[in-house]
Amino acid sequence: MAESINGLKRTHYAGKISTQQIGKKVTVMGWVQKRRDHGGVIFIDLRDRSGIVQVVFNPDNNERAFKKATELRSEYVIAVEGEVEKRPEGNINPDIPTGEIEIRGNRLRILDESETPPFEIDDDINVGEDLRLKYRYLDLRRPRMKKNLELRHRVMKTTRDYLDDNGFWEVETPILTRSTPEGARDYLVPSRIHPGHFYALPQSPQLFKQLLMVGGVERYFQIARCFRDEDLRANRQPEFTQIDIEMSFIDKEDVFSLVNGLMKRLFALVDIEIPEKIPVMPYQEAIDRFGSDKPDLRFGMELKDVSDVVKDSEFRVFSGVVKDGGQVKGINFKGGAISPRSKIDGYTDYVKIFGAKGLAWIALKENGLKSPIAKFLSEKELEGIKEKMGAQTGDLLLFVADKPSIVADALGNLRLKIAREEGLIPDGVYKFVWVVDFPLMEYDEDEGRYVAKHHPFTAPLDEDIPLLDSNPEKIRSKAYDFVLNGEELGGGSIRINNKDLQMKVFNALNISEEKASDKFGFLLEAFNYGAPPHGGIAFGLDRLLMVLSGSESMRDVIAFPKTQKASSPLTEAPSTVAEKQLRELHIKID
């Protein structure tokens, strides 16, 4: 039967007890990890959030406590009073911090009993994630999960302290706001007081943080909850957390300096040192060299343009594409010439996923070239290709010929696939880069209009503003992304702070003056009253924690995450609601 804590006070956390406490009386509280009966003595591994300590119950020491210890089972909640002793020489456990000591149990209280858990409370378990999420409160008892939650706390506290030291104010922005033209993936909340009207949960605090700058706050941050009702891919959540930052009277270099300092502190929490200066790479260079605006710099295999070499080739697949304004690029898989044809065929199928029509290849074997296209290329063209690609005997050259966007997408992804499969990515290496000068907008063929590459409040580069009326697709923006090892950790921009320029950008994006006024009127009105130059950045906290903790799943760094189907096995959300509630909200479901 469970006993009351009845004024008993914990004196130490289990995992913090050391040889310094030998001879001292302690009180520890936690869960029974394991019970072992050995030679008339009972050994208990007591676990709390700090770790494990061994407790020994001996009938010669205290028969009542020993007898009660025979009742203990896994996950019983207990309190133990006892004396810290040095373990006998043969019983020292070097695998745990408390392995040199044990507690001689003098008094035991059973604070609560437990049923047999559906899985063992241990890091090395082999159970489905749905079961872990259904019993998340048990899953959180595992050391790795507790360590991740503690790291999350440390990251948030360090962020707050750092930004406070740099003059920032933490300001909360509304959770119930309104939907915007860009808000196709908003979560909507019906209003009971205003029938037929809906709030939207924010996908980001973007508009409000800009209004805070107009309001003279100057330096704002928030660890913000955001919501996005999108089809979930791996490591996406319908509700997520971002470190949101906005500053007035700054340029992008000020943002870079602030963020570099913050990242230095955060990565130091896990003993990772990052460089004082993080390189900056223009968007177009990232696309040209790596086929991605999130370049992974931990390995080579860069894209090489051989269009000039093959523009007059008899191989029409190459020369025809170049004549039509496309390009021919390749990657050099060093040492890949030994790859079997089946593997190359697999690469061909893979690039087709990204719109490529096929994959040409040349294997530089010891006994000469092997390639289905070599016979169509002159000796001069072959030598030119090898020179451009730094090719040597043993290499496998892989080519895509198409319009530039398809070439970049196909080869950029193939580069990553080969690197992962062939073990070309070094462990424990962290390559940061700022990617800048993104296109302000891109043409969406499905919608038949230009859409913002980031969002419609991003400022264009000053020298590109005249292109708004003639070549909007050529306008570069004052946007920037913070990238680590091929993953975007954060993104931001310098914002538009002038109403006339904002309306010009809206016009280029086919957002009419009427629609802009309807949806963003409060922001445009604010611009009439002196908006300072401002900009900022937002970091996905969950993704950042994945990197810092070395977790493979975002769900392992969130206390109560949703599944990939945006549901909760624990609470069974989302759920149906009572007909009465729907009537009060004036909602009818067909």
UniProtKB/Swiss-Prot annotation:
Pfam family, one: tRNA_anti-codon
Keywords: Aminoacyl-tRNA synthetase, ATP-binding, Cytoplasm, Ligase, Nucleotide-binding, Protein biosynthesis
Signal peptide (residue range): none
GO cellular component, one term: cytoplasm
The protein's enzyme class: ligase
Catalytic activity: tRNA(Asx) + L-aspartate + ATP = L-aspartyl-tRNA(Asx) + AMP + diphosphate
GO molecular function, one term: catalytic activity, acting on a protein
Protein's cellular compartments: Cytoplasm
Any single GO BP term: aspartyl-tRNA aminoacylation
EC number(s) stated in the UniProt entry for this protein: 6.1.1.23
CDD domains to which the protein is assigned, alphabetical: AspRS_core, EcAspRS_like_N
SUPFAM superfamilies, per database record: Class II aaRS and biotin synthetases, GAD domain-like, Nucleic acid-binding proteins
InterPro entries, per database record: Aa-tRNA-synt_II, aa-tRNA-synth_II, aa-tRNA-synth_II/BPL/LPL, Asp-tRNA-ligase_1, Asp-tRNA-ligase_1_N, Asp/Asn-tRNA-synth_IIb, AspRS_core, GAD-like_sf
Stated family: Belongs to the class-II aminoacyl-tRNA synthetase family. Type 1 subfamily.
Identification of the protein by name: Aspartate--tRNA(Asp/Asn) ligase
Taxonomic lineage of the native organism: Bacteria, Bacillati, Bacillota, Clostridia, Halanaerobiales
Gene designation per UniProt: aspS
